[in-house]
Design a protein with these regions (language model features):
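Structural recognition of the beta-strand scaffold that forms the well-ordered cores
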Residues: 15, 36-38, 90-95, 120-122
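Catalytic metal-binding/acid-base residues of hydrolase active sites
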Residues: 42, 95-99, 124-126
Length: 159
């Protein structure tokens, strides 16, 4: 599926929403719950948006030529498009990937600031360690949003 497409049957509805990276993100409605799965949607270059960043294109050994402000604008644009479909989710699965470097929670925080969020489930953090995802707990708890503190691979939860 591509952004804007949807599929449903008598049990589930799936809407493909955008991404500023590969693939799409998803809104899934099942058993009376609305779930958002971000896929690779994130503010991936947040670490470059520092006080000394003067705007425009920069060179990164890891990524080559990038424009962090342009990427953030694209990311926020995708959030705006998602908001046209839904402004609240019972469950949100979102990348909290410490490999991004400083600012790696920025995308998740921006999402939570724009959407009413039930349970927050971090993802894409195994390479940077489970504790790297826990950094979002203080932010979610301050907003009274439950956070699934995943502590090992294969862990599951009943919702």
């Amino acid at each position: 599926m591509v952004k804007g497409n949807s599929w449903c049957d008598k049990n589930i509805k799936v809407v493909a929403t955008g991404s500023n990276d590969s693939g799409v993100s998803w809104i899934v409605e099942v058993e009376g719950r609305r779930i958002f799965h971000a896929g690779d949607l994130n503010n991936w270059y947040a670490r470059f948006l520092t006080d000394d960043y003067e705007g425009g294109t920069i060179w990164s050994m890891e990524f080559g030529e990038i424009d962090p402000q342009k990427d953030e604008k694209q990311y926020l644009g995708e959030l705006k498009d998602i908001r046209k479909i839904a402004d609240s989710f019972d469950i949100v699965l979102f990348p909290v990937d410490g490999r991004i470097g400083n600012g790696y929670t920025r995308g998740a925080r921006q999402f939570i600031e724009q959407f009413q969020t039930g349970l927050f489930v971090p993802m894409h953090f195994v390479a940077s360690g489970f504790k790297s995802a826990w950094r979002m707990m203080e932010f979610t708890e301050a907003r009274q949003i439950p956070f699934w503190k995943i502590e090992r691979e294969g862990e599951s939860i009943n919702i």
